[in-house]
Structure formats: C-alpha cells, structure tokens
C-alpha cells in the first residue's frame, strides 16, 4: 500500500512493509527535522509515555507544546511499547499491522469489550482552531496518535479505536454527501505532497498504518447514500433512481387542464384561467402566493391534483421507465466526455463532472433524493424551486401521511437497491455496492466500519413483512455486505446506527450480523441515571443469554450527544456543566454490565477537554476545531478512564443498584464472582443543569432542570463487608488514589452531595 514512495524495477521483489515504513519514517525525519530534539526532551517524553502507554495531553496542549521532532520521537516510543519498533526500525509481519491481528484475535469481540474506548475523529479538525480555521496537517494527525489512550492488554482491552468521519469531498458542506470517492483537498497536506510526492489518499493510508502500529484499531463511516450528482452516480447512473422533471411537468400540466375543465360551472371562468396559469408556471419556477379568492380555487385544484401527481411519479419509477432515463443519462455523460458509453465505467473516467451536471440539469434529469426518516414509497414530484434551480418533492409515510416537514435528505441520492413497485431486488446494484464497500475497506485496511442512517430499516416505516418499502438500504443488503466483510476478515467489527427503537435488536444482530448497536444515549441523555443504565445492561444481558442468540451483541454507550441538526433532541453534554460531564463519563466507566452485557464507550474528539461546541461545524466545513484549554477537566477525565481500565471490578464485574431516590441520591455496587472485594459508589445523580423533556397532554416541553444538593444521606454496608478505603482524586499525581477509610461501624454517612458529585469506596469481605 505504501510502496508509492519507492520506485522499483519490475523484477524486484516487493519489500517487506516494515522495511518500507522504516524508509518512510527516515524521510519524514529529514523533512520535519526529526533529529532536532535534546536528550533531556527525549528523556521526559520517554518517561511519561512508558508510564502511561501514551502521552496524557489534551490535543490542544499537544498542538501548542509538541513540535514535529517531539511527535515522531514520542511515536517511536509508543511503537516500541507495541513491539513493532526496535533499534530505530520497524519490525513486524505484513499480516500483523492491525493491533487486532497482533493480539491474535480472530473475531469481532474486541470492539464489544467493557472499558474499550472508541473516539470519533475528524482529520480536518485536528489543527489548532484556536489560532486558525485551516485544516490540520499530517503532523497534527500524528500528535493525535501520540495522545490516544492505551488499553489493557492483560484484559484483552485494546487501545482506543479511532472512528474516522468520512474524508471524501462533499456537497453542501455535509460529510455524508460525498461528491466522489476520493480524498477531500481539505485533508491533503500540501507540504508533505511537495516534499515526498505523497497523494492525499496515500497520506490517509499512512496515517491509518501508523495508528494501527501504535495499537489503535481504525473504523470508518460507511454511507448507504451518495451525493446527488456524485462521480459514481455519473459513472454508473443505474445505481440511482432518476427523474425527468420536464416530462413530469408536461404530464402534470395535462392533468391540470383536465381538472380545470370540470370547473366550468363551479368557478368564474376568468378566475380559473388565472389559477391554471399560476399552477402551471409554478411547476417551473416562481411563487404560488395569491389572494384568498384565488387561493380557494388553487387549493381545490391542488387537492384533486395530488393523486395524479402520485400516479405520474410512480409511473416514472417503474423499472422500464428507469432504464430509459438511465440510458439517456449515460449518453449525455459520454457525449460531454467526447466518447462512447462503454468507455465510462469508473469515477476516474469522469473528468468533466461540472459540465456533465450542467448538461443533465439543462435536460431536466435529476437523480432521485431520499426523504424523511419516516417516509416510504417514492418521492412525489411537487414543482421546481421558486428560483427554478432544483426540484421539490413531497414525501409520505407508509400510512399515506405527508411527512415532508421532516424531509432533510432531499440533497442525497440513495442507492437503487430495490424496485419498490414489486419489491424485486436490484441485484446488480446490490453487488456493486457490496464490492464498493469491500474495496474501500481493503484500500484503507480498516478494522471495522460504522453503517450510517440505518436506524429504521426493519420497522414499519421501511418494510412490510420482509419487503422493503422505502429508500433506505434493505436489511438483506446489510446482511450480505456484513457477512462478506466478515468472511474477508474474521476480526472485522461492524457498528450500526440503530438507536434501539422498536426493540429490533435480534434483526440487527442475528439477521444483519452487527456487533455493536449505537444505542439511544443521543436522544435520552436526561433519562440515563444509574438505575436506567443498569436496567439497560440487564436487557442486553437477557438478550445475549437467550437460547437463540449466537455470540453476543453490544450496545454502545455514547458520551457525546452532539446532534444539533435535530433541535428537538438537542442533548449536548456541555449543558451539564463540568461536574455533570465528569459524572456522565464516570457513569459510563463505573456501571459495567458483566460478561454478557459488555459495552464500549464512544466519545468525540474535544470531549476530553470540555470542548462543548464546534464539532458539527468542523465536520461540515472541514476546518480545525476551536478547543477548550481545560487541563484540570482533562486530567480528571483521563484519570477516571485509567482507573476503570486497570481495576478488576470495572473491567470484569457487574454493577447493581442499591438505592436510588427521587431527591438525587444514588448508590450502586460493582461485584464479581469469586472476588472478595467490591466497589461501592454514592452520588448525586442530578446534573447542575440539564435540559429535560416532559410530555403531557400529547405535547412535549423542554425545560432546564437545576440539580439540588442532597443532604444527610446514608447507606448500610452488609455486615460481612468492611469499608477499607476511599478513592480520592490526587491533584498532584493526577490519579484516583486509595486512602484508608476509618469508620466505626458499617454505615456510610454523607452530609451533603452537590449535583453530580460522586464518591467511591473499596469494601472487603471479612
């Protein structure tokens, strides 16, 4: 994959990858002055990295304090700790670049492991946004590798998994609307390209390889849709549905004429002619704003026209009609490129993307968009926009209700997986898609993927029985894709964006072969108190212990809930305040589910330093993140993670609720079979401030709930246990350290617990 740096004679045997990478590292040191680092600086970095397995800095500190030489030296230490670097050279087998492979793991259980972390990272955002919005460069990426937390190899907990946001060029500033399968120019490091002639694609490949050698698995977002006029849609028009808006408009105009004929005795003739003219004109552009007198006729016309619109649109989506339009699109694409249709096969053949798009729009040819999260059937053409620049569609759910107000996906192009008129699967498109995903994963050597936008594929909104009825990717396609990827790579892990609606866990796990489900933390942050989390763990345990369940599935715990696109959710973690955010992290690390309910945690770059805004803007605009410089928050965040990774009870035990009161007081324990020790946690589970949603009389109201201090609480410890110590955060050591706890009896008293304050103790069986 990286031999691009070194030209070889045709007969020369391919170099071992470790030799290649050693040469690449040497060249990187040359251009980045990697030798300009003092022995004292080396000793400092070596001591810290060897102690922790990584450099415990927030990314903003790494950006401001580490130069390229520091970064490369630090990574050498980290690679050495991962047994892939010795005597200033890489040393590994070509089939063991992935840390999962090096660990000897031949299944996907590694990503499900309790205490395993998954960090969402946007490469473009890794620059210093506090200084400039310019995207991060290659050295900035490497600084992130250096600071990523390690795991616990003795417990088979791998180091933090990198979850990469799509790095393709995009439309409308949205990472989930790729305009091609290439690499965005915002990700490319021009300096590295100029010095070593490394393309953007090769830079990303090199970063992923370096990450895996540093112990970090890498997964990637996979999309079941593409951009409206992406290169792949132009190269292979048959993978999408298409409309000819000119033909649709002509057909609707005829229907308008027929309906108007029935108005001869119902309305004034001149009024009807005015309304007819407006109705026809607005199909192409302009506004339908008019006075109340005309509006009555117009609304009557629109009501009678609606079923005709549906029929006209549905007819155009029939298999034979789609074939005709696809053939026209192919002819136009070939004509613009001055070639024949048989010469256009891949994205590389699309060299005049803009010209092709303009010509297609001129001819009235548009790929068909998705719809609303709950829409079914085909989109119904309504009209062109007021400016006449793009088509507008109405969307309906499976009951026929208009759900257009939820349609935020009109700018994407779903793949043409199924003929909705009869449920027939479009096998060529399915095979194309599966091979595309497989090739992408092979190109970048991913250890897993996360499937986007699949949270309703098996409920009544998207299928009737087993027959797909919406634009969403069908479960049968997901099953085929996932099983293919797992056959290619036994340790390959697959995450589903499924938020547990409809209780469809078995379909995602047993039928579609997913390993981890997204969970509902995004929409239910305010409900996730310790009691509810433990209840969630128990539900997962019950499923995994069922007789028909083969293997296990996991449900992700999501620390970050940034979902600003949907303001009705609006569950940003920063709203909890610093202490509230720390307690949220603590809950995810100190409420383990036990052997049959293991759950990893996902967080977003910036969370660890209490960066509360900006992530979504960076993902869309491909700019660097403005980061908070809250080192104290980071140090506590990091200390909680390290403690939980090392402790036998948090890695292997199971949390059980002792008591949870409405005033905010909660107590739970973590126990393990055959272990004489238990952890006991007491806390005030209310955050200092939090948005909550109250539903009453069919309406939902969002309010700000302020947490209150809990006074005079106590808990009785069973007589067979003795309270021996309390773990208290040491600001000097930046660790939770064990301190002897002197207690005359077996009652723990708490005079006061502030909102989100937590305490934890070790109890030993007497």
What is the predicted role of each segment?
Residues 589-595, 607, 614-661:
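Aromatic- and carboxylate-lined catalytic core of secreted/periplasmic carbohydrate-active enzymes
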Residues 209, 220, 225-253, 453-526, ...:
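Aromatic- and carboxylate-enriched substrate-binding clefts and catalytic-loop regions
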Residues 321-373, 491-621, 685-686:
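Conserved alpha/beta catalytic core and glycan-binding cleft of carbohydrate-active enzymes
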Residues 119-121, 162-164, 218-220, 449, ...:
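Hydrophobic faces of well-ordered beta-strands that scaffold small-molecule active sites
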Residues 130-134, 191-197, 459-472, 572-576, ...:
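Short, flexible/disordered intra-domain loops and linkers
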Residues 658-717, 757-759:
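Carbohydrate-binding surface patches
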Residues 2-6, 10-217, 225-431, 695-696, ...:
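N-terminal structural segment of carbohydrate-active enzymes
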Residues 298-316, 325, 420-502:
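Active-site neighborhood of glycoside hydrolase catalytic domains
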């Amino acid at each position: 994959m990286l031999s691009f740096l070194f030209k070889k004679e045709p007969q020369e045997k391919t170099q071992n990858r470790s030799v290649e990478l050693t040469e690449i590292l040497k060249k990187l040191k040359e251009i980045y002055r990697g030798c300009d680092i003092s022995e004292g600086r080396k000793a400092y970095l070596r001591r810290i990295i060897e102690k922790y397995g990584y450099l415990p800095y927030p990314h903003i500190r790494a950006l401001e304090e580490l130069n390229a030489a520091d970064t490369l030296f630090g990574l050498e230490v980290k690679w050495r700790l991962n047994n892939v670097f010795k005597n200033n050279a890489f040393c590994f087998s070509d089939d063991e670049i992935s840390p999962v492979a090096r660990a000897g793991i031949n299944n996907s259980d590694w990503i499900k492991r309790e205490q395993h972390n998954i960090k969402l990272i946007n490469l473009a955002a890794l620059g210093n946004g506090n200084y400039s919005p310019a995207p991060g460069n290659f050295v900035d990426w490497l600084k992130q590798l250096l600071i990523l937390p390690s795991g616990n190899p003795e417990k088979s907990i791998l180091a933090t998994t990198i979850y990469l946001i799509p790095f393709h060029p995009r439309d409308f500033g949205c990472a989930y609307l790729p305009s091609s399968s290439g690499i965005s120019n915002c990700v490319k490091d021009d300096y590295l390209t100029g010095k070593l002639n490394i393309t953007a694609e090769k830079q990303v490949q090199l970063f992923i390889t370096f990450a895996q050698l540093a112990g970090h698995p890498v997964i990637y977002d996979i999309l079941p849709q593409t951009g409206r006029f992406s290169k792949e849609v132009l190269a292979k028009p048959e993978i999408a549905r298409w409309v000819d808006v000119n033909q649709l408009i002509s057909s609707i105009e005829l229907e308008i004429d027929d309906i108007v004929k029935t108005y001869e005795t119902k309305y004034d003739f001149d009024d009807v002619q005015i309304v007819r003219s407006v109705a026809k004109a607005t199909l192409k552009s302009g506004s339908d704003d008019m006075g109340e007198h005309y509006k009555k006729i117009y609304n009557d016309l629109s009501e009678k026209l609606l079923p005709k619109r549906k029929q006209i649109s549905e007819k155009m989506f029939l298999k034979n009609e789609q074939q005709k339009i696809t053939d026209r699109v192919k002819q136009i694409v070939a004509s613009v490129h001055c070639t024949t249709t048989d010469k256009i096969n891949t994205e590389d053949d699309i060299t005049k993307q803009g010209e092709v798009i303009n010509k297609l729009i001129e001819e009235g040819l548009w790929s068909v968009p998705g719809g609303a999260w709950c829409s079914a059937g085909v989109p119904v053409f309504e009209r062109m926009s007021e400016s006449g620049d793009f088509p507008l569609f109405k969307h309906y759910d499976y009951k026929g209700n208009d759900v257009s107000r939820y349609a935020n996906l009109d700018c994407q192009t779903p793949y043409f997986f199924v003929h909705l008129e009869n449920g027939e699967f479009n096998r060529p498109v399915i095979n194309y898609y599966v091979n595309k995903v497989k090739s992408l994963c092979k190109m970048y050597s991913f250890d897993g993927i996360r499937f986007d936008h699949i949270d309703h594929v098996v409920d009544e909104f998207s299928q009737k029985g087993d027959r797909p009825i919406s634009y969403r990717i069908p479960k049968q396609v997901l099953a085929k894709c996932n099983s293919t990827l797992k056959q290619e790579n036994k340790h390959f892990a697959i995450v589903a964006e499924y938020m547990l609606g409809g209780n469809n866990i078995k379909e995602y796990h047993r039928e579609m072969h997913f390993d981890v489900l997204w969970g509902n933390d995004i929409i239910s942050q305010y409900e996730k108190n310790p009691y509810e989390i433990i209840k969630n763990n128990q539900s997962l345990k019950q499923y995994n212990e069922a007789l028909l369940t083969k293997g296990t599935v996991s449900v992700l715990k999501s620390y970050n809930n940034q979902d600003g696109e949907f303001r009705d959710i609006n569950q940003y973690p920063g709203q909890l305040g610093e202490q509230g955010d720390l307690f949220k992290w603590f809950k995810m690390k100190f409420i383990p589910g036990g052997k049959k309910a293991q759950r990893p945690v996902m967080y977003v770059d910036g969370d660890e330093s209490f960066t509360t805004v900006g992530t979504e803007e960076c993902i869309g605009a491909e700019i660097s993140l403005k980061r908070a410089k809250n080192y104290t928050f980071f140090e506590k965040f990091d200390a909680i993670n390290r403690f939980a990774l090392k402790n036998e009870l948090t890695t292997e035990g199971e949390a059980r609720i002792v008591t949870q009161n409405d005033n905010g007081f909660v107590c739970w324990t973590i126990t393990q079979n055959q272990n004489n020790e238990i952890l006991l946690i007491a806390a005030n589970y209310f955050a200092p401030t939090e948005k909550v949603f109250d539903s009453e009389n069919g309406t939902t109201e969002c309010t700000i709930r302020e947490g209150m201090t809990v006074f005079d609480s106590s808990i009785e410890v069973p007589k067979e246990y003795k309270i021996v110590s309390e773990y208290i955060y040491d600001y000097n050591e930046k660790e939770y350290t064990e301190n002897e706890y002197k207690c005359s009896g077996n009652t723990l008293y708490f005079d006061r617990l502030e909102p989100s304050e937590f305490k934890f103790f070790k109890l030993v069986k007497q």
